[in-house]
Amino acid sequence: MKIRPLHDRVIVKRKEVESKSAGGIVLTGSAAGKSTRGEVLAVGHGRVLENGGVKALDVRIGDTVIFNDGYGVKVEKIDNEEVLIMSESDILAIVEK
């Protein structure tokens, strides 16, 4: 896949997770909901500051992140693979390994 996000944008591939109900029943499809975790595939150069400088992003390629799946997150298909394009500010946390 050849895609380069601009500025503070990040390309994330959603990680599918198995969901279980409180009773231990495995939920699939729409009942399970969409995961808000993903792997960072590409990052932009950084956020442009008011003084013209650039602040590097905190996330790196390969990081597993938890993100806010809402307004501002763009879903695209690239090479038949669904990816999310979001600002770094839409990322809530980096999952430490």
Swiss-Prot record:
PANTHER family noted in UniProt: 10 KDA HEAT SHOCK PROTEIN (PTHR10772), CO-CHAPERONIN GROES (PTHR10772:SF58)
Q: Which GO terms describe its molecular function?
A: ATP binding; metal ion binding; protein folding chaperone; protein-folding chaperone binding; unfolded protein binding
Describe its function: Together with the chaperonin GroEL, plays an essential role in assisting protein folding. The GroEL-GroES system forms a nano-cage that allows encapsulation of the non-native substrate proteins and provides a physical environment optimized to promote and accelerate protein folding. GroES binds to the apical surface of the GroEL ring, thereby capping the opening of the GroEL channel.
Subunit-level organization: Heptamer of 7 subunits arranged in a ring. Interacts with the chaperonin GroEL.
Q: Which organism is it from?
A: Blochmanniella pennsylvanica (strain BPEN)
Stated family: Belongs to the GroES chaperonin family.
Question: What biological-process GO terms show up in the record?
Answer: chaperone cofactor-dependent protein refolding
Gene designation: groES
What protein is this chain from?
Answer: Co-chaperonin GroES
Any Pfam family the entry gives: Cpn10
Q: Subcellular location, in the record's words?
A: Cytoplasm
Cross-referenced InterPro entries: Chaperonin_GroES (IPR020818), Chaperonin_GroES_sf (IPR037124), Chaprnonin_Cpn10_CS (IPR018369), GroES-like_sf (IPR011032)
Instruction: Choose one Gene Ontology CC annotation of this protein and give it.
Output: cytoplasm
Q: Which UniProt keywords apply?
A: Chaperone, Cytoplasm
